[in-house]
């Protein structure tokens, strides 16, 4: 009976911590990125699949969340605003990269989409140099030139972590395939 109560208390503590972390993350989103979250183009990223069945929207939110967790875990002194905004916009390419029939289809999406995401983000937002660095270089080593700031290194690590979980289907998206979303 004692073991059961102890286990139950540990689970409750874990869920409380997770709830507090989510609450803090949403507070940071509201404070630093409400314009991005409210934008129609960013909301439309729900219609594009990133890895497996994960929508780009959720992938970017997860990368932003993991970036904050990594920076706190490692006690890295960085600019949270730029970290969150760069993480949210890191895959702002605004097309279905799986669609072989779209205009300008490029098989080397991994090499080209950071530049496309940066161009799209610059059209809609006033970006700092760090935010630009995050968006453009977080695909390193594919992008050849490594990130120049802590924030970009953190988003690079968070993106690779989230992408791995999504690709191995350890973190699932909406469960919908690209074809179901297109309907």
Give the ranges of each region predicted by the language model.
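Metal-dependent phosphohydrolase cores
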Residues: 1-183
């Amino acid at each position: 009976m004692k073991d059961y109560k102890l286990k139950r208390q540990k689970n409750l503590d874990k869920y409380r911590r997770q709830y507090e972390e989510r609450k803090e993350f949403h507070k940071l989103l509201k404070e630093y990125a409400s314009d991005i979250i409210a934008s129609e183009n960013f909301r439309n990223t729900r219609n594009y699949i990133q890895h497996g069945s994960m929508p780009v929207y959720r992938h970017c939110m997860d990368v932003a969340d993991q970036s904050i967790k990594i920076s706190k875990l490692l006690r890295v002194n960085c600019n949270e605003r730029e970290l969150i905004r760069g993480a949210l916009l890191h895959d702002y390419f605004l097309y279905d990269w799986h669609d072989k029939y779209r205009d300008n289809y490029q098989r080397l999406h991994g090499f080209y989409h950071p530049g496309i995401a940066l161009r799209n983000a610059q059209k809609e937002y006033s970006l700092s140099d760090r935010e630009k660095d995050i968006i453009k270089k977080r695909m390193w080593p594919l992008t050849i030139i490594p990130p120049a700031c802590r924030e970009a290194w953190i988003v690079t690590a968070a993106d690779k972590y989230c992408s791995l979980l999504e690709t191995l289907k350890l973190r699932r998206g909406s469960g919908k395939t690209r074809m179901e979303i297109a309907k």
